[in-house]
Amino acid sequence: MILSGRRKFFYSFDLVKAAVSKIGPLTGREEKSLESFEISPDSRTIAFVGNEGYILLISAKTKQLIGTLKMNGSVRSLAFADGGNQLLSSGGDGHVYHWALGTRKCIHKAMDDGSLSGISLCTSRDSSLFATGSTSGIVNVYKRDDFLGGKRKPLKTIENLTTDVGEMKFNHDAQILAITSRKERNGMRLVHVPSFSVFQNWPGPRFSLHYPRCLDFSPGSGFLSVGHAGGKVLLYKLHHYQNA
């Protein structure tokens, strides 16, 4: 388990040994915060958002810096694809970058439709879809192969949020896309991806999501957890999915 905050270092927690290790500051780097990161699906690489357009690649095994990637603008969001062999990034220049981690090269860069500054990214488990979120609350959903092939228009533009897009997640079979805004009370929506319609009956009037900060689906999408600014984690059962 990796834990980080607005510090020059992060923590690695070994669940088996119940041991905590402090990692950093990273040699040769001047980042004052390592609060934003993503772990690859194969658990080999940790990618941290760095300063001045840099993405820091850390070995999950050794916890050492193994490389950097450089965007033209600031980095705001990261998402792995292709089982951890590729990385997507977005930020201040409004572009979505695709990186091949084997060569540490940018293999594709294109504008996110209608975005001036990208602040959120997520990919589906099979990497066929990805979603981008912007400061205007707009979420674009793309078919990744089409985007890489030069098609710039998203499959769908979702306009149900009105402030900065925060955490986004596809569930395991990419039937549901959860989107949030941490600046909006109850600022979370569940989108049915095949029809791109928003579930109007969720979470319902009896439940308050406060200001959502983070979320995740269980491996089989039987459960959805949401953490909010009030310091609580809410657990929901999704009855459509039989397996947890």
Describe every region a protein language model picked out:
Residues 213-214, 218-244:
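Blade-level signature of beta-propeller repeat domains, shared across WD40, Kelch, NHL, RCC1
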Residues 2-4, 46-49, 88-91, 130-134, ...:
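Conserved beta-strand element within WD40/beta-propeller blades
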Residues 153-167, 197-219:
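Conserved blade-ending motifs and adjacent loop-strand segments that build the rim/top face
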Residues 7-24, 29, 50-75, 83-84, ...:
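Per-blade loop-tip surfaces of WD-repeat and WD-like beta-propellers in eukaryotic adaptors/scaffolds
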Residues 162-193:
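Loop/turn-rich, solvent-exposed surfaces of beta-rich toroidal or solenoidal domains
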Residues 37-43, 78-85, 90, 121-128, ...:
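Loop/turn segments within WD40 beta-propeller blades
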